[in-house]
């Protein structure tokens, strides 16, 4: 029973190390993007949610100021 626990624990740790190495490799590949189109897509992904969040905050205030029905 004890040896089974040790081997399962070893497999678990080896699996987590393998996952972390794969994630680091994936991150390194994402950093190596040199094409401007791919870089623009990444910029859009970062800024579109920010713009949408700001619009969601300010649109009700602007609508309230225009219609004066607050």
Curated annotation (Swiss-Prot):
InterPro entries: Antimicrobial_frog_1, Frog_antimicrobial_propeptide. Expressed by the skin glands. GO terms for biological process: defense response to bacterium; defense response to fungus; killing of cells of another organism. Keywords: Amphibian defense peptide, Antibiotic, Antimicrobial, Cleavage on pair of basic residues, Disulfide bond, Fungicide, Secreted, Signal. Residues 1-22 form the signal peptide. It comes from the Eukaryota. Residues 23-44 form a propeptide. Its main location: secreted. Disulfide bonds join 64-70. It is found in: Secreted. One of its GO terms (cellular component) is extracellular region. Antimicrobial activity against the Gram-negative bacterium E.coli, the Gram-positive bacterium S.aureus and the yeast C.albicans. Belongs to the frog skin active peptide (FSAP) family. Brevinin subfamily. This is Brevinin-1PLb. It comes from Lithobates palustris. The lineage of its organism: Eukaryota, Metazoa, Chordata, Craniata, Vertebrata.
């Amino acid at each position: 029973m004890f040896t089974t626990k040790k081997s399962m624990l070893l497999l678990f740790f080896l699996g987590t190390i393998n996952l972390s190495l794969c994630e680091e490799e994936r991150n390194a590949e994402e950093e190596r993007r040199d094409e401007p189109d791919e870089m623009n897509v990444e910029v859009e992904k970062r800024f579109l949610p920010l713009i949408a969040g700001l619009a969601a905050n300010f649109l009700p205030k602007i609508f309230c100021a225009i219609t004066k029905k607050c």
